[in-house]
Every structure is written in structure tokens, then in C-alpha cells.
Design a protein with these regions (language model features):
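Core catalytic alpha/beta fold that binds nucleotide/phospho-ligands
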Residues: 2-296
Length: 296
């Protein structure tokens, strides 16, 4: 999750604990398997006919369910913020126009007037980040711990400083730790680029994450933990509820040298972002002893 304020760089929910109330970031999560259960009709009520028709045209059922889950959670968050009943959530206008090009295509970062949010999804989880601060530049990404990163990740996605750190980790740490480090870096870069709306239209190496051995140690410890509790902080969580693996704050800073848009001249504008990772585990519905770990 990335967050930049002007001054500084059943869905379940954790909160960003150290921020002032006006800058607090909330994370909502919806397992996509919800769409296969009895609650799917409640979630589908948030969606309009156009979204359901679009889902029906997607090539796989997994893609359709992920899309429906993302749109339903997005509209549920917006409805709660705008005090709109769920029966009218499908009428909330979503602006998908791109602010970084003049093509007119609807491939931009989704925006809803009066709601500051960002969405991400990976099978089997959809997450949404929300802030009451309308000026905050907010982005979120989620990846499974076993995610397969693209070939040439270090060469193409990392800055020179990050690559040097990566190569040292590759020499000094076991392969699973190097992979965790790579997933953490990728989620951070994706979150920043989603926050700005650039996405992968720019090279990820323009996002530079400030890395330390302490951060890597904390990430490794968190992903090896099985801490009781779920995102709601319930004393008696359901066996299959999404669980947070640590209450420790996993944070860093990042900078992004944003390319100038259009005919704007001069050097690229540099912006600062605060990063926070939330390690979670989603137990298997049929066998809660086994869980899929993810990094938000």
C-alpha cells in the first residue's frame, strides 16, 4: 500500500494505526470465493447490469469472479462513504477516463466523486484502500507469496540501488527470502504507480524504495508467523477468516520520478510516498489448516 499526502510523502478491515484520523488509510478485503456462496446475491446487488454483462464476456470464470468481486467491493465502499443504500449503489458513477493521455479510452484509474480509494485483486482476494483525506494520493496492490514474477525482474524493475541490494540478498539469504523480497518490492512499486495513475505505462524502476536489512528481517518474520486473529480483530475469528500475520508496522519510504505529461518541459517531478505492507493469510475453506499467504 502506498500513501502520499500533500505535506508528506463480509468485507474485513484493518486500519493504518499511526496516522491522524484525517489521514488514516483503511483496507477492506473480500475473498473472491464469497461469490460462490450464499452471500453472492447480497454482493451482486451492488452491481449494475452493464458490469454483470461485462463479466459474462470474460474468457474464464476466474476472471469473471475477480471482476465482479472488485466492482462489488468498490461500490460497497463508495456507498458507505456517500451514504447511498446498497440498492442504489449500482447507480454510483465511476469515471474510468485516463488523465495521462488524450485517447479518450476508459483505461484510467477508477474515480468516484467524493471517495478517495484504490483497488487491487489477485485470485483469491480483492482489496480496496480508502482514505477520508481527499488530497491523499493512494494506491494499493496485493500479490500471493508464491507469485511468479516476470523474467528479468531485477534488471527491468529495479533501480541501481535496489538492484545492488537485491544482488546482496541473493548471495546472503535463502531463495525463499529473496523471492519474498521481490514480491514486497513489486507490490510497493505497483501501489505507487497505481496511486499516480501511471500503472505500467512507465518503467517500475522509476519508483525507488528505501530498503534496509531490518525491513527484510521483519517481512521474513511476519510471513513465517501464524498469529491468531483476523482483520476485524474478533476474539473468536471464524476458521476461514482472512488473518493478519503480524501487528508490527512494516513501513518504508519511496520516491517516484514522474514523467512530464504531454508537452510539459523540464525535469521529471519527484514525489515521495509512505509505504506499508500488510501480510495476510486466507485459510482454505475446506481445510483451514492450510492457508494461502499474500502481501498487501
Amino acid at each position: 500500500m502506498s500513501y502520499s499526502a500533500p505535506e508528506t510523502p463480509s468485507a474485513q478491515r484493518p486500519e493504518r494505526p499511526t496516522a491522524r484520523p484525517s489521514e488514516r488509510v483503511q483496507i477492506f478485503a473480500l475473498p473472491t470465493r464469497t461469490m460462490y456462496g450464499s452471500l453472492r446475491f447480497s454482493w451482486l446487488s451492488y452491481l449494475g447490469l452493464a458490469e454483470q454483462q461485462h463479466a459474462a464476456q470474460l474468457p474464464t470464470s476466474t476472471a469473471a469472479v475477480s471482476y465482479l468481486s472488485t466492482q462489488a467491493l468498490m461500490r460497497a465502499m463508495a456507498a458507505a462513504r456517500l451514504d447511498v443504500p446498497s440498492s442504489a449503489a449500482s447507480e454510483i458513477e465511476v469515471d474510468r477516463s485516463c488523465t495521462l493521455c488524450t485517447s479518450g479510452k476508459k483505461h484510467g484509474k477508477p474515480r468516484i466523486a467524493g471517495v478517495n480509494f484504490n483497488m487491487s485483486q489477485v485470485n483469491p482476494l480483492v482489496v480496496g484502500a480508502f482514505s477520508r483525506n481527499p488530497s491523499a494520493v493512494l494506491g494499493v496492490d496485493v500479490e500471493t507469496l508464491d507469485a511468479r514474477l516476470f523474467s528479468g525482474f531485477a534488471r527491468l524493475a529495479l533501480s541501481n540501488e535496489e538492484r545492488a541490494f537485491y544482488e546482496r540478498v541473493a548471495q546472503e539469504r535463502p531463495a525463499p527470502v529473496l523471492h519474498l523480497f521481490s514480491v514486497a518490492l513489486w507490490t510497493a512499486k505497483e501501489a505507487v504507480l497505481k496511486a499516480t495513475g501511471h500503472g505500467l505505462s512507465v518503467v517500475p524502476s522509476l519508483v525507488r524504495v528505501q530498503l534496509t536489512d531490518d525491513l527484510l528481517d521483519a517481512l521474513e518474520l511476519a510471513m513465517n508467523e501464524e498469529v491468531p486473529g483476523d482483520l476485524l480483530g474478533s476474539d473468536t475469528p471464524e476458521p476461514t477468516a482472512l488473518r493478519v500475520l503480524t501487528q508490527d508496522s512494516l513501513t518504508a519510504q519511496a520516491t517516484f520520478s514522474a514523467p512530464r505529461v504531454g508537452n510539459q518541459g523540464g525535469e521529471a517531478a519527484e514525489r515521495s510516498f509512505s509505504l506499508q505492507w500488510v501480510p495476510v493469510a486466507l485459510p482454505d475453506a475446506e481445510n483451514p489448516e492450510h492457508a494461502q499467504k499474500m502481501l498487501i
